[in-house]
Structure formats: C-alpha cells, structure tokens
C-alpha cells in the first residue's frame, strides 16, 4: 500500500470524488493547489508532500546475545545460559529489551535415584507506545491515525517540532493525527518478570521400571505505568501552533500477577518377552494444573506536573478497577505399546481430563486413541524389493479423540451484572438509592468438552539407504460439540444465553512429505518438501436452508459449506463504455411488473452510471439486490499449504533456505485506505486506486470512479473486494562459514562460526495489503531482518 504523497494531486482527487457524489469540493482554493504543485518539493516545510509509510517506519539494529556453559562430573551435570535481547523497533517508542537466564542441574544421588532442577526466567521492558491505548499511541492505532492524515502535513521538522495542518482547508480532525506525535505522546514502561521452575525426581528401583514425579511453578508479574507527554503541532507555512494535546491529563498504574502450578507422576515399564519377540512399553500417569491471576489498575486525572510519575502527582478524580480468575485441570492417562519382532506395532491410549470450567456432572471427558503400524520392509516377501533399494516401508492406521475446554472460566455459570449499556440497575428504596443486580447471562449446566475425533491412514517409505524418504497421509478430523452462541428467545429478556455444544465441523485431506539427502565427497545436501490439502465443511449447525445462516459481515456459517465462507454479490464489470451502459438500460426496460407497475431493478443500490460497478442478477428475477448473494469462496482458511527446506554444506561453508506458502484462501477486504475508490476529506488515498480509477474517456480502469466515502454505490459487499491470500515466502536464507579446527585451536576455541541471514525478505503474492498472513488487518506486519552473527564454543 503506497499512499498518494503528492499533495496537489491529493487535493484534486479529493475534489473529484466529492463532486462525483454531488457534493461541494473541500479544496476550493485552486490557486493554492497550483502553488503547491509549482513548489515541487523545494520547500518541504511549507509545501510538504509526505509519505506516511516512509515517515512512520524506520530501519533499526537489534541485538541478541547468548552465552551458555555446560559441564559437571560423572554424577552431577549442569547447563546454564544467559541472554540479552534489544530491539528498538521499527517505529518510535516501541522498543523492547529482555534479559533471560537458565540453569539446569541433574544429579545421580543413587544408582536408582536422580534429582534434577530446571530454573529459567526473564526480565523485560517495553516502551509504552508498543502496547498502551492511552492517548491513542498503540502500534495498531498508528495505522489508524496515519490513515487519517494528509500528505500536506509535515510529520516532524529537522528541529524536532511536529507538524499539523499546513492548509486551513484540510479537515481539522487531521491536525491531531500525526502518527509520530501520537507515538511519542505517552511516556512510561511495561516491566515484566517471568520465573519458571521445575523439580524432578526419577526412580529406577528395578530393571525396566521408571517412576518420575515433577513439580512446576511459574510466576509472572507485569507492571505498567503511563503518563502523557504534552506536544504541539505546527503549521509551518504560517509558523504557528495549530494543535496541542494538552487535554485532561491522567496517570495510570497497573499491576497484574499470574501463578501457575503443575505437578505430575508418571510410571513407565518396558520389557521384552518370548525371546525378545514381544516388546511391551507401558505408561500410567496423573497430572494436575492450577492457574490463578489477579490484577489492579488505578488512574488519576489532572496531573500537577507530567514529570511526576506517581498517582499523587495528580489532583483530580481517581478510578480503580481489578479482577481475578482461576481455573484448574486434572488428568489421568495411560498408554500401552506392543510390538512383535518390531514389525507389528500397536499403541493404545486413554486419558480422562477434568476441567473446572464445567460443572461437576459434565467436568470429565474421556479421550481414547489407538494406532497400528506394519513395517513391511522387514517381511521376507519384501526381500526382493530390499535388494533393489527399499529401505523403509511402513503402513499406519490410527483413530483417536482429543478434548478442548477453551471456553471462559465461568461460562457454565449464571452471570449477574449491576448495569448494562442502558445504565445501572439501581432502584429507589425508602428515598435511598440501592444497588441492583440483574441476570445478564443464563447458566448452562450442560456445557461440556468439545471433542475432536481423528482417523489417519498413512504410509512411510525410504529408498536407497533412506536417501529418499517420504510420507503420505489421509486424515479425517471431525470436531463435535463445538461451542457456539445460539440466538436467545425473547422470553429471556435482556439476559443472553450461554454458549452451547451444538455444532460439528469436518476437516479432511492429505499430507505429503518428500525428502532427499546425499553426500558427494565433501559436499552434503538435503531437500525436504511438504504439502497439505484440507477440505473444511460445517456438518451440523442450524439446518441447511438459508434460515440457518449466521452472518458475520461477508462471512457466514452455513451447514453443508466451509466455515466462514464468503457470501457476496458477484461483480459483472466496471461500466466504462456506452455498450456497458446499454446493459443497465436493458435491465430497466425488461424489469418485472408488479401490481401493474414496473419495478426499479436498481432500487436497492442505486442506478449505476459510467464508472460504477454492475452486479450480476444471480437469481434471474430481473432485480439487483441482496437476494443475489451467493457463496463465492470457501473463506480465509487455506486449502493448500506447502514448504521447502534446502540445506547444503561444503567443507566449512553451510547454506540453508526455507520457503513456505499457502493457496486456496480468500478474504473479503474493503478498506478505504487500501483498496476502495472512496475519498474522505482529511484521509489518505491509495496511489494504486488513484492510478487505476475510472474517469471520463477511460476504458481500461481497474477501479470504479472516486466517490465520497459515505456514498455506498460501489461499496456493496461483492467479490470485487475479494482478495486472494495465496503467497510464497522465502522465510530465511542463511550462509555461514566455520573456521577449520586447526585454526580455532590456536586461539583456544573449539568452534568459531560466522553467519548472515535474510529473514522475511521475499514475499510473492497478489494480495494488496501489508502481509497476506495478517490478512486485512492494518497492523504490525512481519519485519524484514538482516542478521549477522557469531557462534563461539570453548
């Protein structure tokens, strides 16, 4: 997305759109437009032509350092590491700094007893604009405010002053939307501490039997503080301040803590019987987890001095809020592995999970699974193929189920509230105001586990001493009792009904992997690829007729179709010629007659003119309206995913490249900043739209004519705004060199390697947004990184 940065062009384009919607031109001073154009960038402070993308994003240098040590004796071993990370971010005031450490210790106290401890943690600090919504200075808000500016605004002068409007005819709301000013209008810090510890005892009282018990604890503490930074926005043509953010100031403090406890006991037994022909590997265990969180937030207004970073530095009203939550999980599980001569493999699993998120009668879910594999390459009748290069040939069959309890901690319970959108539920009693409560959500005692049942049939193969390897799998994955919101009958009043286990979704497809590895002298290389195809279908919802459709904008959930399919009008063409316009008149002439009167076929969206979109009459009733919508795409979930991993080494030189992509995914994306032929006074306009728009005399336009943003004629939900999310990314290219050992030993090093890499540098896609992986979100895309590093081993 590249915005129009020539301000003279921008003003004329805005005028064009408003006039074509029958509205007055916002920029009436034609002399100023010509004055701006004539300057041609000679005086960038007085006559700016700003590209907000270039001004907002910057290159930065990030650091990541890790030192690790390991050692010990025959009975005691340790590993420790220390790390430091510093990333200043690609936007101002969005930096991140992190210190981390790890210590693992393992001790053989007795021949039958091992004790181990693993402790890790980090301390991080984040600049406030990376997260806070105070003063509109979050990263995501940067895009929102940057879109609501114009190229006629200086973002920041060389002397550090921020720009506002340089043209009084610009929209006044643009004056306070300078994204650089927004990023720097908040001060504070986000400080986070995380400590994880795990203590393990392993007993081996007799051969083949192992008993392991562990206890884990994680502690997270996040402290946030924010206060405003008062800044001014300047009109550099007249050298006056036209904007200041000195509104009602506030200071905020937040503290949130999380405690997570986990403990488990697992017994394992392994043996071989009947002359080692029968192998038995059994496991039985239990685990328990508890999560607890609480937070507190306080805000106070009217700061005496913004340099005072404490709540008592403000003298106005104060507000405070807090919340807490907890959930727990208990599991019992077992597994038995059997093999006969390591040719026939059988595995049986059973687990029972209990979740505190469900009521007692629905708390436990049982999830069994089993798999069988047959190693054909070990059969005698395969000797001929083994002689011809067959190394591995395994057939696999499995069936199993898993549970999902990803619901709110208290969704099974009734919810009471003291207010709703219409106000508080207080009432008068004896001339006094009493606090009132009303039921906001009905309880659902039947809420229970969402279950996924999966069948898999596969084959593994290897040829030529496993230089060529591959797998082929067919999977059938059905998720039942999916939690959805169903409409509430009017008898429930204002109370909403809870989520219910009412839907089923089927995913089925194939997964393929293929790899080749070889060595020719000092040259080694490998090529590994993967491919996945998935078909998605809602198999149970609210019925197959249109009354069972749930709408979410352009996306729908409809039984018998892919989840989040796009349900849209189909665009026939952009009306650009007299022949195109004749089709409009033909529909008017042939319109149906109802009660003796000819129906206006375009009443729903307006009669299209040259430069407008013409939609298709899908149901052939002679009328263009919302009844002409149909499913035009299976939605944003990709049908195809693929990847390729290349590795090569020659003596001390090593090379690696990772490619990844997807296809068969589409989104409905209509964004005035990116791909809509709409103009709005004080807002940006995409250059691609401006260059591709229709205007009188043009017959090869790729976008409709410009219209004022509230004019909906060319903004109906249609497949014109359906974007393909297919892409191929070269995720990483790395080249390294390891010095010969004879050189590193001279400087007391065991190994010394230099490397450089390019990360997220190459993306091939037709998607017009920032990044097909984040779809239509105008948010922080994946950054391109150039990395240089050194690996040292002593």
Regions found by a protein language model. Name each.
Residues 54-129, 140, 145-150, 193-198:
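Transmembrane beta-barrel wall of Gram-negative outer-membrane proteins
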Residues 635-668:
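Glycine-rich, aromatic-lined ligand/substrate-binding cores of catalytic
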Residues 63, 98, 104-113, 118-123, ...:
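Extracellular/periplasmic, surface-exposed regions of secreted and cell-surface proteins
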């Amino acid at each position: 997305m590249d915005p129009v940065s020539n301000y003279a062009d921008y003003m004329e384009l805005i005028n064009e759109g408003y006039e074509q919607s029958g509205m007055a031109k916002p920029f009436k001073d034609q002399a100023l437009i010509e004055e701006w154009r004539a300057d041609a960038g000679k005086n960038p402070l007085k006559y700016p032509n700003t590209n907000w993308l270039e001004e907002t994003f910057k290159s930065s240098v990030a650091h990541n350092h890790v030192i690790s040590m390991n050692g010990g004796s025959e009975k005691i071993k340790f590993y420790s590491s220390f790390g430091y990370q510093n990333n200043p971010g690609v936007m101002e005031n969005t930096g991140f700094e992190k210190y981390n450490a790890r210590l693992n210790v393992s001790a053989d106290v007795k021949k039958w007893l091992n004790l181990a401890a693993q402790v890790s943690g980090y301390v991080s600090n984040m600049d406030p604009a990376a997260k806070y919504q105070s003063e509109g200075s979050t990263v995501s808000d940067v895009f929102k405010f940057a879109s609501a500016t114009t190229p006629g605004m200086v973002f920041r002068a060389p002397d550090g002053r921020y720009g506002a409007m340089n043209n009084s005819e610009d929209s006044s709301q643009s004056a306070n939307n300078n994204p650089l000013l927004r990023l720097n209008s908040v001060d504070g810090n986000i400080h986070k501490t995380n400590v994880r510890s795990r203590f393990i005892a392993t007993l081996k009282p007799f051969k083949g039997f192992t008993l392991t018990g562990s206890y884990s604890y994680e502690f997270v503490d996040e402290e946030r503080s924010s206060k405003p930074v008062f800044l001014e926005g300047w009109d550099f043509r007249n050298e006056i301040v036209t904007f200041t953010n000195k509104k009602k100031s506030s200071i905020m403090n937040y503290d949130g803590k999380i405690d997570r406890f986990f403990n488990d006991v697992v017994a394992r037994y392994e043996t071989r019987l009947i002359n080692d022909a029968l192998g038995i590997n059994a496991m039985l265990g239990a685990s328990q987890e508890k999560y607890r969180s609480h937070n507190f937030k306080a805000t106070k207004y009217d700061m005496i001095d913004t340099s005072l970073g404490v709540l008592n530095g403000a003298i106005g009203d104060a507000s405070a809020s807090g919340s807490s939550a907890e959930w727990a999980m208990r599991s019992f599980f077992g597994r038995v592995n059997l093999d006969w001569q390591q040719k026939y493999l059988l595995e049986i699993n059973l687990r029972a999970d209990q979740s505190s998120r469900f009521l007692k009668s629905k708390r436990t879910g049982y999830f069994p699974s089993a798999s069988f594999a047959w190693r054909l390459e070990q059969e005698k009748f395969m000797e001929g193929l083994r002689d011809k290069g067959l190394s591995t040939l395994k057939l696999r069959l499995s069936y199993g189920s898993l549970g999902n309890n990803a619901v709110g901690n208290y969704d099974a319970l009734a919810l009471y509230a003291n207010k709703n959108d219409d106000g508080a539920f207080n009432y008068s009693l004896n001339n006094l105001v009493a606090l009132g409560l009303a039921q906001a959500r009905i309880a659902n005692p039947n809420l229970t586990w969402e279950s996924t049942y999966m069948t898999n049939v596969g084959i593994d193969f290897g040829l030529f001493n496993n230089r060529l390897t591959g797998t082929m799998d067919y999977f059938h994955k059905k998720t039942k009792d999916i939690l959805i919101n169903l409409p509430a009958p009017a008898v429930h009043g204002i109370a909403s009904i809870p989520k219910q286990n009412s839907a089923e979704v089927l995913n089925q497809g194939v997964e393929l992997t293929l790899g080749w590895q070889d060595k020719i002298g000092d040259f080694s290389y490998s090529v590994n690829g993967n491919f996945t195809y998935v078909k998605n279908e809602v198999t149970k919802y609210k019925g197959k007729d249109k009354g069972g459709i749930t709408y979410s904008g352009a996306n729908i959930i409809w039984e018998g179709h892919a989840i989040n399919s796009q349900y849209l009008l189909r665009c026939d063409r952009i009306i650009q010629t007299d022949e195109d316009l004749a089709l409009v008149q033909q529909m008017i002439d042939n319109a149906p007659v109802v009660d003796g009167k000819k129906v206006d076929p375009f009443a729903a969206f307006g009669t299209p003119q040259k430069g407008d979109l013409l939609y298709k009459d899908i149901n052939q009733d002679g009328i263009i309206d919302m009844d002409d919508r149909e499913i035009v795409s299976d939605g944003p979930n990709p049908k195809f995913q693929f990847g390729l991993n290349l590795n090569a080494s020659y003596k001390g030189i090593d090379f690696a490249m990772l490619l990844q992509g997807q296809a068969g995914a589409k989104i409905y994306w209509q964004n005035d900043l990116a791909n809509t032929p709409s103009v709005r006074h004080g807002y940006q306009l995409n250059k691609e739209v401006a260059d591709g728009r229709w205007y009188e005399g043009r017959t090869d336009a790729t976008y409709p004519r410009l219209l004022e943003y509230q004019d909906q004629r060319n903004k109906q939900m249609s497949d014109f705004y359906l974007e393909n999310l297919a892409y191929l990314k070269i995720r990483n290219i790395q080249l390294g060199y390891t010095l010969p050992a004879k050189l590193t030993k001279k400087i007391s090093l065991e190994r010394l390697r230099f490397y450089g890499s390019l990360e997220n540098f190459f993306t091939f896609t037709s998607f017009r947004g920032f990044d097909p992986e984040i779809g239509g979100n105008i948010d922080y895309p994946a950054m391109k990184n150039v990395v240089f590093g050194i690996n040292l081993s002593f």
